[in-house]
Amino acid sequence: MALGNALVEARDRVAWRLNIKVAQQAQKLVYRYATRRLKDDDVVFLNYGYEEDPPMGIPLSESDELNRYSIQLYHSTAAQADVEGKRVLEVGCGHGGGASYLARTFRPATYTGLDLNSDGINFCRRRHNIAGLEFVQGDAQDLPFPDKNFDAVLNVESSHLYPRFDVFLTEVARVLRPGGYFLYTDARPRYDIPEWERALADAPLQMLSQRAINFEVVRGMEKNLDALESVVDRVAPALLRDWIQKYGPARRAYEELRENTTEYRMYCFVKPAE
Protein backbone atom coordinates (compact mmCIF):
# COMPACT_ATOMS: atom_id res chain seq x y z
CA MET A 1 0.00 0.00 0.00
CA ALA A 2 2.81 2.42 0.91
CA LEU A 3 4.57 1.69 -2.39
CA GLY A 4 1.33 2.20 -4.30
CA ASN A 5 0.77 5.56 -2.63
CA ALA A 6 4.34 6.58 -3.41
CA LEU A 7 3.86 5.69 -7.08
CA VAL A 8 0.64 7.69 -7.25
CA GLU A 9 2.40 10.63 -5.61
CA ALA A 10 5.27 10.39 -8.09
CA ARG A 11 2.84 10.20 -11.01
CA ASP A 12 0.97 13.27 -9.77
CA ARG A 13 4.21 15.18 -9.30
CA VAL A 14 5.37 14.41 -12.84
CA ALA A 15 1.97 15.37 -14.22
CA TRP A 16 2.10 18.65 -12.30
CA ARG A 17 5.59 19.40 -13.60
CA LEU A 18 4.50 18.79 -17.18
CA ASN A 19 1.34 20.84 -16.73
CA ILE A 20 3.14 23.77 -15.13
CA LYS A 21 5.80 23.83 -17.84
CA VAL A 22 3.07 23.95 -20.47
CA ALA A 23 1.32 26.68 -18.50
CA GLN A 24 4.50 28.69 -18.15
CA GLN A 25 5.12 28.53 -21.89
CA ALA A 26 1.50 29.39 -22.65
CA GLN A 27 0.94 32.19 -20.15
CA LYS A 28 2.29 35.01 -22.33
CA LEU A 29 0.05 33.95 -25.21
CA VAL A 30 -3.00 33.32 -23.01
CA TYR A 31 -2.82 36.62 -21.13
CA ARG A 32 -2.14 38.59 -24.29
CA TYR A 33 -5.06 36.86 -25.97
CA ALA A 34 -7.34 37.65 -23.03
CA THR A 35 -6.26 41.29 -22.93
CA ARG A 36 -6.83 41.71 -26.66
CA ARG A 37 -10.24 40.00 -26.52
CA LEU A 38 -11.32 42.20 -23.63
CA LYS A 39 -9.98 45.32 -25.42
CA ASP A 40 -11.48 48.25 -23.52
CA ASP A 41 -13.66 46.02 -21.35
CA ASP A 42 -13.45 46.97 -17.68
CA VAL A 43 -12.05 43.67 -16.36
CA VAL A 44 -9.34 44.92 -14.01
CA PHE A 45 -8.98 41.90 -11.68
CA LEU A 46 -7.77 38.42 -12.62
CA ASN A 47 -7.61 36.74 -9.18
CA TYR A 48 -10.14 34.30 -7.70
CA GLY A 49 -11.43 36.28 -4.73
CA TYR A 50 -11.48 36.19 -0.91
CA GLU A 51 -14.14 36.45 1.79
CA GLU A 52 -14.01 35.81 5.52
CA ASP A 53 -16.73 34.59 7.88
CA PRO A 54 -18.15 36.87 9.16
CA PRO A 55 -17.74 39.01 6.03
CA MET A 56 -14.91 41.56 6.00
CA GLY A 57 -17.25 44.42 5.18
CA ILE A 58 -14.51 46.85 4.19
CA PRO A 59 -16.03 50.13 2.93
CA LEU A 60 -15.83 50.42 -0.85
CA SER A 61 -16.91 52.96 -3.43
CA GLU A 62 -19.75 52.04 -5.77
CA SER A 63 -17.32 51.33 -8.60
CA ASP A 64 -15.08 49.17 -6.40
CA GLU A 65 -18.03 47.22 -4.98
CA LEU A 66 -18.32 45.35 -8.30
CA ASN A 67 -14.93 43.78 -7.55
CA ARG A 68 -15.32 43.33 -3.79
CA TYR A 69 -14.08 39.74 -3.51
CA SER A 70 -11.02 40.26 -5.67
CA ILE A 71 -10.24 43.49 -3.82
CA GLN A 72 -10.47 41.76 -0.46
CA LEU A 73 -7.61 39.40 -1.36
CA TYR A 74 -5.43 42.41 -2.17
CA HIS A 75 -6.58 44.27 0.94
CA SER A 76 -5.80 41.35 3.27
CA THR A 77 -2.39 40.74 1.70
CA ALA A 78 -1.30 44.39 1.79
CA ALA A 79 -2.69 45.01 5.29
CA GLN A 80 -0.02 42.73 6.76
CA ALA A 81 2.31 45.76 6.85
CA ASP A 82 1.99 49.53 6.99
CA VAL A 83 2.72 50.80 3.48
CA GLU A 84 1.40 54.35 3.86
CA GLY A 85 4.00 56.79 2.56
CA LYS A 86 6.21 53.92 1.35
CA ARG A 87 7.55 52.82 -2.05
CA VAL A 88 5.65 49.71 -3.14
CA LEU A 89 6.27 47.29 -6.02
CA GLU A 90 3.67 44.77 -7.18
CA VAL A 91 5.09 41.91 -9.27
CA GLY A 92 2.45 40.35 -11.52
CA CYS A 93 -0.04 43.23 -11.53
CA GLY A 94 -2.31 41.81 -14.26
CA HIS A 95 -4.85 44.41 -15.36
CA GLY A 96 -3.99 46.75 -12.50
CA GLY A 97 -7.16 46.60 -10.42
CA GLY A 98 -5.31 45.73 -7.23
CA ALA A 99 -2.66 48.36 -7.91
CA SER A 100 -5.32 51.01 -8.40
CA TYR A 101 -7.22 50.05 -5.24
CA LEU A 102 -4.13 49.91 -3.02
CA ALA A 103 -2.70 53.17 -4.42
CA ARG A 104 -5.98 54.94 -3.62
CA THR A 105 -6.71 53.26 -0.28
CA PHE A 106 -3.37 52.49 1.40
CA ARG A 107 -1.73 55.76 0.24
CA PRO A 108 1.82 54.65 -0.53
CA ALA A 109 4.25 57.33 -1.69
CA THR A 110 4.64 55.46 -4.98
CA TYR A 111 3.19 52.23 -6.35
CA THR A 112 4.80 50.43 -9.29
CA GLY A 113 2.98 47.58 -11.02
CA LEU A 114 5.10 45.18 -13.09
CA ASP A 115 3.89 42.46 -15.45
CA LEU A 116 5.36 40.31 -18.21
CA ASN A 117 2.35 40.91 -20.48
CA SER A 118 3.07 44.07 -22.50
CA ASP A 119 -0.55 44.26 -23.70
CA GLY A 120 -1.68 44.13 -20.08
CA ILE A 121 0.70 46.94 -19.15
CA ASN A 122 -0.65 49.08 -22.00
CA PHE A 123 -4.17 48.35 -20.72
CA CYS A 124 -3.14 49.43 -17.19
CA ARG A 125 -1.63 52.67 -18.44
CA ARG A 126 -4.83 53.55 -20.32
CA ARG A 127 -7.18 52.50 -17.53
CA HIS A 128 -5.54 53.64 -14.27
CA ASN A 129 -4.53 57.29 -14.08
CA ILE A 130 -3.61 57.92 -10.44
CA ALA A 131 -0.88 60.13 -9.01
CA GLY A 132 2.09 58.06 -7.86
CA LEU A 133 0.98 54.93 -9.76
CA GLU A 134 3.04 53.65 -12.68
CA PHE A 135 3.21 50.43 -14.70
CA VAL A 136 6.32 48.75 -16.09
CA GLN A 137 6.72 45.75 -18.39
CA GLY A 138 9.27 43.29 -17.05
CA ASP A 139 10.22 39.82 -15.85
CA ALA A 140 9.64 38.72 -12.24
CA GLN A 141 12.93 36.82 -12.39
CA ASP A 142 14.94 39.84 -13.60
CA LEU A 143 13.38 42.89 -11.98
CA PRO A 144 14.39 46.10 -13.82
CA PHE A 145 15.05 48.11 -10.66
CA PRO A 146 18.10 49.07 -8.58
CA ASP A 147 19.03 47.33 -5.34
CA LYS A 148 17.20 48.43 -2.16
CA ASN A 149 14.65 50.44 -4.13
CA PHE A 150 11.36 49.51 -2.43
CA ASP A 151 9.89 49.38 1.07
CA ALA A 152 7.46 46.61 0.17
CA VAL A 153 6.99 44.05 -2.61
CA LEU A 154 3.54 42.55 -3.21
CA ASN A 155 2.82 39.36 -5.16
CA VAL A 156 -0.73 38.03 -5.52
CA GLU A 157 -1.70 34.71 -7.14
CA SER A 158 1.06 34.85 -9.74
CA SER A 159 4.24 33.09 -8.62
CA HIS A 160 3.04 29.53 -9.36
CA LEU A 161 3.73 30.23 -13.04
CA TYR A 162 7.30 31.45 -12.63
CA PRO A 163 9.79 28.96 -14.10
CA ARG A 164 12.36 29.80 -11.37
CA PHE A 165 10.53 30.73 -8.18
CA ASP A 166 13.82 30.73 -6.25
CA VAL A 167 15.28 33.34 -8.61
CA PHE A 168 12.18 35.49 -8.13
CA LEU A 169 12.66 35.39 -4.34
CA THR A 170 16.30 36.42 -4.73
CA GLU A 171 15.18 39.36 -6.88
CA VAL A 172 12.56 40.36 -4.30
CA ALA A 173 15.22 40.45 -1.59
CA ARG A 174 17.56 42.42 -3.85
CA VAL A 175 15.12 45.26 -4.58
CA LEU A 176 13.84 45.48 -0.99
CA ARG A 177 15.41 47.86 1.46
CA PRO A 178 16.54 46.34 4.78
CA GLY A 179 13.44 46.19 6.96
CA GLY A 180 11.21 46.08 3.87
CA TYR A 181 8.29 43.67 3.54
CA PHE A 182 7.40 40.91 1.08
CA LEU A 183 3.59 40.57 1.12
CA TYR A 184 2.72 37.37 -0.64
CA THR A 185 -0.19 35.06 -1.41
CA ASP A 186 -0.47 32.09 -3.78
CA ALA A 187 -1.35 28.39 -4.01
CA ARG A 188 0.44 25.09 -4.63
CA PRO A 189 -0.76 21.47 -5.00
CA ARG A 190 -0.05 19.42 -1.89
CA TYR A 191 2.77 17.42 -3.54
CA ASP A 192 4.59 20.66 -4.48
CA ILE A 193 4.39 22.20 -1.00
CA PRO A 194 7.72 20.78 0.32
CA GLU A 195 9.63 22.39 -2.58
CA TRP A 196 7.68 25.63 -2.13
CA GLU A 197 8.54 25.70 1.57
CA ARG A 198 12.21 24.95 0.87
CA ALA A 199 12.48 27.84 -1.58
CA LEU A 200 10.87 30.22 0.91
CA ALA A 201 13.10 28.97 3.75
CA ASP A 202 16.24 29.42 1.63
CA ALA A 203 15.35 32.97 0.55
CA PRO A 204 17.23 35.83 2.28
CA LEU A 205 13.99 36.87 4.01
CA GLN A 206 12.56 36.29 7.49
CA MET A 207 9.03 34.91 7.78
CA LEU A 208 6.79 36.91 10.12
CA SER A 209 3.50 35.13 9.48
CA GLN A 210 1.87 32.39 7.44
CA ARG A 211 -1.70 31.10 7.24
CA ALA A 212 -3.76 28.83 5.04
CA ILE A 213 -6.68 30.64 3.38
CA ASN A 214 -8.43 27.88 1.40
CA PHE A 215 -11.73 28.55 3.15
CA GLU A 216 -11.62 32.28 2.43
CA VAL A 217 -10.63 31.84 -1.23
CA VAL A 218 -13.29 29.17 -1.85
CA ARG A 219 -15.89 31.41 -0.21
CA GLY A 220 -14.71 34.32 -2.35
CA MET A 221 -14.86 32.21 -5.52
CA GLU A 222 -18.42 31.13 -4.73
CA LYS A 223 -19.51 34.73 -4.28
CA ASN A 224 -17.48 35.82 -7.32
CA LEU A 225 -18.78 33.09 -9.63
CA ASP A 226 -21.01 35.31 -11.75
CA ALA A 227 -18.13 37.71 -12.45
CA LEU A 228 -15.74 34.86 -13.31
CA GLU A 229 -18.25 33.27 -15.69
CA SER A 230 -18.95 36.63 -17.30
CA VAL A 231 -15.25 37.03 -18.14
CA VAL A 232 -15.17 33.54 -19.67
CA ASP A 233 -18.22 34.40 -21.78
CA ARG A 234 -16.49 37.48 -23.15
CA VAL A 235 -13.04 35.97 -23.69
CA ALA A 236 -13.47 32.31 -24.65
CA PRO A 237 -14.38 31.22 -28.19
CA ALA A 238 -18.07 30.34 -28.36
CA LEU A 239 -17.44 26.64 -29.04
CA LEU A 240 -15.35 26.29 -25.87
CA ARG A 241 -17.41 28.30 -23.38
CA ASP A 242 -19.48 25.44 -21.95
CA TRP A 243 -16.41 23.21 -21.59
CA ILE A 244 -14.40 25.95 -19.86
CA GLN A 245 -17.26 26.71 -17.47
CA LYS A 246 -17.43 23.04 -16.41
CA TYR A 247 -13.82 21.88 -16.66
CA GLY A 248 -11.58 24.95 -17.09
CA PRO A 249 -8.84 26.15 -14.73
CA ALA A 250 -11.13 28.19 -12.45
CA ARG A 251 -13.47 25.22 -11.92
CA ARG A 252 -10.51 22.89 -11.34
CA ALA A 253 -8.91 25.31 -8.89
CA TYR A 254 -12.19 25.63 -6.98
CA GLU A 255 -12.51 21.86 -6.59
CA GLU A 256 -8.86 21.40 -5.58
CA LEU A 257 -9.05 24.17 -2.97
CA ARG A 258 -12.34 22.88 -1.60
CA GLU A 259 -10.95 19.34 -1.32
CA ASN A 260 -7.61 20.59 0.10
CA THR A 261 -5.55 18.91 -2.62
CA THR A 262 -4.21 22.41 -3.26
CA GLU A 263 -3.29 24.80 -0.45
CA TYR A 264 -3.62 28.56 -0.74
CA ARG A 265 -1.48 30.54 1.70
CA MET A 266 -0.83 34.12 2.73
CA TYR A 267 2.63 35.17 3.96
CA CYS A 268 4.42 38.19 5.34
CA PHE A 269 8.24 38.32 5.20
CA VAL A 270 10.73 41.01 6.15
CA LYS A 271 14.22 41.63 4.79
CA PRO A 272 16.58 41.56 7.78
CA ALA A 273 18.60 44.64 8.65
CA GLU A 274 22.17 44.59 7.41
From Swiss-Prot:
Keyword Transferase found: yes
NCBIfam families, per the entry: FAmtase_mtf2, PthPhpthDimycoMt
Described purpose of this protein according to its UniProt entry: O-methyltransferase that modifies the hydroxy group of the fatty acids. Oleate is the most effective fatty acid acceptor.
Gene Ontology MF term list: fatty acid O-methyltransferase activity
UniProt keyword annotation of Plastid present: no
Name the UniProt record assigns to this protein: Fatty-acid O-methyltransferase
InterPro entries cross-referenced by the UniProt entry: Erg6_SMT_methyltransf, FAmtase_mtf2, Methyltransf_11, PthPhpthDimycoMt, SAM-dependent_MTases_sf
Catalytic activity: a fatty acid + S-adenosyl-L-methionine = a fatty acid methyl ester + S-adenosyl-L-homocysteine
One record GO biological process: methylation
Enzyme class: transferase
Phenotype of null mutants: Cells are unable to methylate the glycopeptidolipid fatty acids.
Organism of origin: Mycolicibacterium smegmatis (strain ATCC 700084 / mc(2)155)
UniProt-listed Pfam families: Methyltransf_11 (PF08241)
Record-listed E.C. numbers: 2.1.1.15
Segments traversing the membrane: none
